[in-house]
Design a protein with these regions (language model features):
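NTP-handling and nucleic-acid-processing catalytic cores
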Residues: 2-18, 138-361, 366, 475, ...
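Long, charged, mostly alpha-helical binding arms that flank functional sites
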Residues: 3-5, 229-233, 366-369, 373-416, ...
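Acidic, turn-prone loop/beta-hairpin segments
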Residues: 82, 438-442, 446-451, 560, ...
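N-terminal catalytic cores of NTP/NDP-binding nucleotidyl/phosphoryl-transfer enzymes
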Residues: 28-97, 126-141, 252-253, 317-353, ...
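Flexible, glycine/threonine-enriched loop-and-boundary segments that flank and lead into catalytic domains
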Residues: 217-249, 294-321, 325, 424, ...
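Basic, alpha-helical terminal appendages of large translation-related enzymes
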Residues: 1-36, 267-270, 280, 311, ...
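Residue patterns forming the tRNA-binding/recognition surfaces of aminoacyl-tRNA synthetases
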Residues: 15, 19-23, 94-248, 255-256, ...
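Conserved oxyanion/phosphate-binding beta-strand-loop segments in alpha/beta enzyme cores
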Residues: 1-40, 69-78, 101-111, 213, ...
């Protein structure tokens, strides 16, 4: 074939991508005769542009998918769009458009960019989660969960802007104010929908043990999030004429500190607090003040602790001491019962609160069985009990058992398990989301919207007018109002992996036959920032679908790879006390005649810049690199090669213009090496090993050593950077042997062909052309992964270590199986060795074949 001796990435990539599209190369169906492999990268939110994080994520997935395809497996790699969410709604408002139009336009742009990367994607399965054909089945499934009593509605705290009359996400609350209008944000209880994930807490916890190919860090994060603990529910009676009917339930994992309780603290939302607020104006004002806090657990952990004394007393269940009851802003209503037994001596939050309000601090646990003054901080470690009456000297476990038994006898305590995990609140007071398919009855209660009315679609008019559909209507003779909340977007991303197995099925949510063929996903790729919410919800949803009979696997993802962040240099200047971040593409470096950097400025400006260091690429620091610019300049294969070569996938990757240029230089060299081989006129022949000289045998051995290493790097270790480095080393050896004869040409060709095959998953476009250049009979897209020829690994020579009186004095190369006498003779004559045995008597020579010789001489 006629080929150019110069590498033109753009023409090569256009041709390859057109071939894949026209031939639907990566469209797959179920095939019982082939082993399946389902490779899935977390699908993107259509923000409008790919960033380098996307490129890295999808390139890693594509390399794995292409490699598995070369192993002969039936490989599915789909792509879709996580299209609902607040950013689209806000962008639509700012741009005076409709979220669906804004999203559709972004999808078109990003799809084109993904295609330009040359990803081996089955585009026939593509969907966006904002399409009614997708969320219809999500709505249907929610109604099934409602019928199975796995869904309920209750009032829950949210961030509320009274001016905008809307709920705000935690990130939209800035210094206690609304990000949009600066009004003071309040905490408000509104009815919201929940799914009972806590029913599956034990299975979600135990299932982590079966996820052998998940990072330990992710599994630890999920264990901590589920947070199973063993403790005691303790009942404290309230001593008050008006409220003596109240009993306060408290859950504690540290019953050994019960004798150190000096007060009780209630959450501002606790029922007793609500009752007191109606009668006590000071408490009502305090609760109102607390309502301005954010509602996230992280905020509670760092909030400045404030409280108010209710004037009520609780009775200690073992000592009958009277304990003051306070309301504290640091108590979470959603953990335990919303009340805590405060032990300032042994809990840091209680300690800080007690110090602030001069409450009693009592030490009841000691690490050395001594009573020490607690002034600086609480003693949170477990030890032996002191100041605890009959429980003195007991260890934690002994005290747990003894106190639990005594409380049980008094009918004031019971051993139980508790979870940090809370039921999943799926309501969002937003327009751009999947509508929750429920009717609220005017008479009270809720009923699901029936299947024949699904999907419940979004009303564009309501968005344009900013209205919520809360008109009364009649359904089956009952007055109802359609639910106006939409689903949390984590709902859509919790089951998309299963829908990809049958995305064009209009008759059912999941086709069990197809789902059971493809699932679980064999390799899932995404950032570790999704370790808790997305990955936990996806595991939960998978089990819900299993219990509905839609699929039969227990877990959604067999193997999980969390790719590292992409880093880049950052630059800024200060203006009015604020840092103004400048894109690296707008930075100019000034050097003196010796090449030393003297200053950094913004291009076409005298403004001097400071370095912000190497940080994660982000909009906030304006240090992102537009991958499309790099593709336009160098081609997609260069971007892919740099991305995979710069670092192992789990580690952070630092962007480098020099690295990109180096990747492009290597591809040009690969093209030149292959071209030189292609123009040689020697006929293609089988290798006759008997005719090969030592240099040719060495190249064959290097070729098959490289195949063995790269196969291990791809399949077991996922260290693609070292695999690429190994191929580069092999090609260096190729250039040392010229195709001056048939035998040299044959072993060079073998090395080059195998190099192309091993690089194909990483740089597929150029490899297609190089493969054709060498006149191979089958397309590379149908070629198998290269196999190691074990016979080629056998060395004809071996290096022998020579010792004199046990000390290493030299090395020689000898033929494998060479005569012992000849080897000993060579050893004695070795230049350095001869100096140490000169004029000495050789008493004996110890010879370990193919390893070492030890010459023992007189001293």
């Amino acid at each position: 074939m006629v080929v150019d001796d110069k590498y033109d990435p753009h023409s090569v990539e256009r041709e390859a991508q057109l071939f894949w599209e026209n031939n639907q190369t990566f469209s797959v169906n179920e095939c019982s005769e082939k082993e399946k492999f389902y490779c899935l990268a977390m699908f993107p939110y259509p923000s409008g542009k790919l960033h380098m994080g996307h490129v890295r994520n999808y390139t890693i997935a594509d390399v794995i998918a292409r490699y598995q395809r070369m192993l002969g497996k039936n490989v599915l790699q789909p792509m879709g769009w996580d299209a609902f969410g607040l950013p689209a709604e806000n962008a639509a408002i700012e741009n005076n458009t409709e979220p669906s139009e804004w999203t559709k336009k972004n999808i078109q742009t990003m799809k084109s960019q993904l295609k330009s990367l040359g990803l081996a994607i089955d585009w026939s399965r593509e969907f966006a989660t904002c399409e009614p054909s997708y969320f219809k089945w999500e709505q249907w499934f929610f109604t099934r969960l409602f019928e199975k009593n796995l869904v309920y509605k209750k009032a829950s705290a949210v961030n509320w802007c009274p001016s905008c009359e809307t709920v705000l996400a935690n990130e939209q609350v800035i210094d206690t104010s609304c990000w949009r209008c600066d009004s003071v944000v309040e905490k408000k209880n509104i009815p919201q929908w929940f799914i009972k994930i806590t029913k599956y807490a034990d299975e979600l916890l135990s299932g982590l043990e079966d996820l052998e190919h998940w990072p330990d860090q992710v599994k630890t994060m999920q264990r901590n999030w589920i947070g199973k603990s063993r403790g005691i529910n303790i009942t404290f009676n309230v001593k008050d004429k008006e409220f003596n009917h109240h009993q306060l339930e408290v859950y504690t994992t540290r019953p050994d500190t019960l004798m150190g309780v000096t007060y009780l603290a209630l959450a501002p939302e606790h029922p007793l607090t609500s009752d007191l607020s109606k009668k006590n104006n000071d408490i009502a004002k305090f609760v109102k003040r607390c309502s301005r806090q954010k509602v996230s657990e992280e905020e509670f952990a760092t909030v400045s602790k404030i409280g108010i004394d209710t004037g009520l007393k609780a009775i200690h269940p073992l000592t009958n001491d009277l304990l003051p009851i306070w309301v504290g802003n640091y108590v979470l209503i959603d953990y335990g019962s919303g009340a805590v037994m405060a032990v300032p001596g042994h809990d840091q939050r209680d300690f800080e609160f007690a110090k602030k309000y001069n409450l009693k601090i009592k030490q009841v646990v000691s690490l050395d069985k001594k009573d020490t003054s607690i002034n600086e901080k609480a003693i949170i470690e477990k030890g032996n009990l002191i100041n605890s009456g009959k429980y003195n000297d007991l260890t934690f476990n002994e005290a747990f058992s003894a106190i639990a038994e005594d409380l049980k006898k008094l009918n004031q305590g019971e051993v139980t398990s508790n979870y940090r995990l809370r039921d999943w609140g799926v309501s969002r007071q937003r327009y751009w989301g999947a509508p929750i398919p429920m009717f609220n009855l005017l008479s009270g209660g809720e009923i699901p919207i029936p299947y024949d009315r699904l999907p419940v679609s979004l009303d564009k008019q309501k968005f344009n007018k900013g209205e919520r559909n809360n008109k009364t209507q009649e359904f089956n003779g009952r007055q109802v109002i359609q639910e106006t909340d939409t689903f949390d977007t984590f709902m859509e991303s919790s089951w998309y992996h299963a829908r990809f197995t049958c995305s064009n099925d209009t008759s059912q949510m999941i086709d069990p036959v197809k789902a059971n063929y493809w699932l679980p996903v064999d390799q899932y790729i995404g950032g570790i920032e999704h370790a808790i919410l997305h990955l936990l919800y996806a595991r939960f949803f998978h089990k819900l679908m299993r219990d509905e009979g839609l699929l039969n696997s227990d877990e959604p993802f067999k193997k999980l790879l969390c790719q590292g962040m992409v880093l880049s240099e950052s630059y800024f200047y200060e203006k009015n006390g604020k840092k103004i971040w400048v894109s690296p593409s707008e930075v100019e470096f000034h050097r003196n005649e010796n090449g030393k950097l003297t200053k950094i400025t913004q291009i076409n400006s005298d403004v001097e810049l400071s370095s912000g260091g190497v940080t994660k690429m982000s909009k906030s620091k304006n240090n992102g690199i537009d991958p499309q610019v790099i593709i336009d300049n160098y081609g997609a294969d260069t971007v892919r090669l740099f991305t995979m070569f710069a670092a192992p996938p789990e580690q952070t990757m630092e962007w480098s213009e020099q690295g990109v240029a180096g990747a492009f230089k290597f591809l040009k060299r690969l093209w030149k090496i292959t071209y030189d081989q292609a123009v040689v006129n020697f006929p293609k022949e089988e290798i006759d090993k008997a005719k090969l000289n030592q240099q040719q045998l060495d190249l064959r051995r290097k070729t098959h050593e490289t195949i063995a290493k790269v196969t291990d790097d791809y399949s077991r270790r996922n260290t693609f950077n070292t695999a690429i480095a190994a191929v580069m080393e092999l090609l260096n050896e190729v250039t040392k042997i010229r195709p001056l004869c048939a035998s040299s040409s044959i072993v060079r060709r073998e090395a080059i062909i195998n190099s192309i095959l091993m690089l194909y998953p990483v740089v597929p476009h150029i490899c297609i052309k190089l493969w054709e250049m060498l006149d191979n009979e089958v397309p590379i897209s149908e070629a198998s992964w290269p196999e190691v020829d074990e016979s080629a690994l056998q060395k004809s020579f071996v290096t022998i270590v020579i010792q004199v009186n046990g000390k290493v004095r030299g090395r020689i190369e000898v033929g494998i199986g060479e005569d012992d006498a000849a080897v000993k003779h060579k050893a004695i004559r070795q230049e350095n060795v001869s100096r140490f045995i000169e004029n000495r008597e050789i008493k004996k020579i110890i010879f370990v074949p193919n390893k070492l010789i030890n010459i023992v001489v007189s001293m």
